[in-house]
UniProtKB/Swiss-Prot annotation:
UniProt keyword Disulfide bond, yes or no: no
Reactions catalysed: a (3R)-hydroxyacyl-[ACP] + NADP(+) = a 3-oxoacyl-[ACP] + NADPH + H(+)
GO molecular function, one term: NAD binding
Family membership noted in the UniProt record: Belongs to the short-chain dehydrogenases/reductases (SDR) family.
InterPro entries: 3oxo_ACP_reduc, NAD(P)-bd_dom_sf, Sc_DH/Rdtase_CS, SDR, SDR_fam
Enzyme class, spelled out: oxidoreductase
Keywords, comma-separated and alphabetical: Fatty acid biosynthesis, Fatty acid metabolism, Lipid biosynthesis, Lipid metabolism, NADP, Oxidoreductase
Pfam families: adh_short_C2
Species assigned in the record: Staphylococcus aureus (strain Mu50 / ATCC 700699)
The encoding gene: fabG
Pathway: Lipid metabolism; fatty acid biosynthesis
Binding residues for substrate: S141
Name of the featured protein: 3-oxoacyl-[acyl-carrier-protein] reductase FabG
Length: 246
């Protein structure tokens, strides 16, 4: 009988994280839904996951806090018996021009988006080493490859995630653990919905496929990297951006 595998998705109460959690559930994973703010939204995702016939629970943790992350990993293993897939999706923005950016704006984004990924990988690794298997998928961004004005802090973290992914992949490969990154381009969200038609048209001119991506495009890519079909892929960054960056 095939054993059910388990996954932890950080920042999974909404947006891309929610879509990833639901897709992994569709693939048969038990899924822990991490959140930082809204317990209500996280619990709603849990109910959607359970409706697919797998187990799920919501767990609050600030990924920038190593102790909270350690406790979260321990709880996931306690409830599910294993941790087979870690998806580092949690992230924030504090946009500002470089000359005007406050130190706190820089630190907040670095702590969540880069240190948070490090914390989760470091605390999840002992369990995966014991299992001699695991898949870690980190969310980067197209801007980590091309840069973006007004987002020096965010861009630095997303470029850093790519480097961290490569280093972790080299360290963990001998133990059967893969580490990859997914770098979304412009994805339909509340942010893109609020943009003017003129600005949307301007953004679309940068995308050869001439459309914005859907969060399911990202979720499907993550699910593939988490699967046995991707066992010979590690240290890679998969760009899902409609050709915006090649």
């Amino acid at each position: 009988m095939k054993m059910t595998k388990s996954a932890l998705v950080t920042g999974a109460s909404r947006g891309i994280g929610r879509s990833i959690a639901l897709q992994l559930a569709e693939e048969g994973y038990n899924v822990a839904v991490n959140y930082a703010g809204s317990k209500e939204k996280a619990e709603a995702v849990v109910e959607e996951i359970k409706a697919k016939g797998v187990d799920s629970f919501a767990i609050q943790a600030n990924v920038a806090d190593a102790d909270e992350v350690k406790a979260m990993i321990k709880e996931v293993v306690s409830q599910f018996g294993s941790l087979d897939v870690l998806v580092n999706n949690a992230g924030i923005t504090r946009d500002n021009l470089l000359m005007r950016m406050k130190e706190q704006e820089w630190d907040d984004v670095i702590d969540t988006n880069l240190k948070g990924v490090f914390n989760c990988i470091q605390k999840a690794t002992p369990q995966m080493l014991r299992q001699r298997s695991g898949a870690i998928i980190n969310l980067s961004s197209v801007v980590g490859a091309v840069g973006n004005p007004g987002q020096a802090n965010y861009v630095a973290t997303k470029a850093g995630v790519i480097g961290l992914t490569k280093s972790a992949a080299r360290e963990l490969a001998s133990r059967g653990i893969t580490v990859n990154a997914v770098a979304p381009g412009f994805i339909v969200s509340d942010m893109t919905d609020a943009l003017s038609d003129e600005l949307k048209e301007q953004m679309l001119t940068q995308i050869p496929l001439a459309r914005f991506g859907q969060d399911t495009d990202i979720a499907n890519t993550v699910a593939f990297l988490a699967s046995d079909k991707a066992k010979y892929i590690t240290g890679q960054t998969i760009h899902v951006n409609g050709g915006m960056y090649m």
